[in-house]
Amino acid sequence: MSPKQTPFSEIIQALADENRPFPAASLRRFSDLEPADLRSLLDEWPRIKTGRKRKLLADLWSLLEVDTVVSFDELARPLLKDPDAQVRALAIRLLGECEDHKLVPTYLDMLIRDESADVRAAAATVLGLFMDLGELEEIPAALYHKVEDALIAVVKGGDTVEIRQRALESLGYSSREEVAELIEQACARIDPVWVACALFAMGRSGLERWSDEVLTRLNDDHAIVRLAAIKAAGELDIKEARPLLLRMLEEGENDADVFEAVIWSLSQIGGEDVRIYLTELLDQAEDDELAALIEEALANL
């Protein structure tokens, strides 16, 4: 009997059974749960071991990253109130593309009051979605500014460095001048992680004002900074970056993440010379994953 035909009650039993690995083929059964199935799962949830719950949600998140059809929103919503911090953080990540602005008050409360730094960091990240929606005027203006104010307060406040960095990245969508000042301050720091966060925010801003800074950072000694600058160059469609990015392809970048980012950013910037280089690179590719990325980049031109 296939997982699709298995009664959901048996799926729940399999999840609760610590003596056997939960079958990966059953993960998709948690997508778009029917109300009755969700109620049954939530009734059993407190009796399922914490490790099994964490593993399930982590596996669902991994599936979500590669499968654009599945949605675990219905499961994740009630788990935002789970007593386990890892479960709460994973629930936020599962809701990473859910545009329901009714979630915002919960996220703001978690950002400010949750005892777990991981949860606060996840909340800071997911609020970036609503910064983007706010700039597009797709959520109420008052709610958008409430998110903006909260994130600015976090960046300026005394929370952990990681949470402040995630908040700055989410603020990248904001057009408020105060945010631009925060980005400039972060970029002026010695810490390369702060600089990378600033560049990430610049890429999200869509503002030409950051082009010179991004171009300068393409040659940075730190891979994390180069990676962020390369991505920002693509997001901002900086034509002047094209020769340097093409040279990176020619010379071969040792860092795989940086090399892949160069390919994608060039696909965003475009140009016939980019098509020629990527086509040649595809012909030489021996790695299937790299070849798939290049094909996707060519399609994006």
Model-derived regions, located:
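Eukaryotic acidic, Ser/Thr-rich intrinsically disordered low-complexity regions
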Residues: 271, 279-301
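Structural signature of alpha-helical solenoid repeat scaffolds
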Residues: 61, 96, 128-129, 172, ...
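HEAT-repeat alpha-solenoid elements in large eukaryotic scaffold proteins
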Residues: 11-20, 46, 50-58, 122-133
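Residue-level signature of alpha-solenoid helical repeat scaffolds
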Residues: 58, 93, 125-129, 169, ...
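Extended alpha-solenoid helical-repeat scaffolds
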Residues: 27-32, 61, 67, 78, ...
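Alpha-helix N-cap/helix-start positions at coil->helix boundaries
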Residues: 20, 35, 50-54, 85-86, ...
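Alpha-solenoid HEAT/ARM repeat scaffold
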Residues: 21-24, 54, 58, 89-90, ...
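Amphipathic alpha-helical scaffolding segments comprising HEAT/armadillo-like alpha-solenoid repeats
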Residues: 2-10, 33-45, 66-81, 100-113, ...
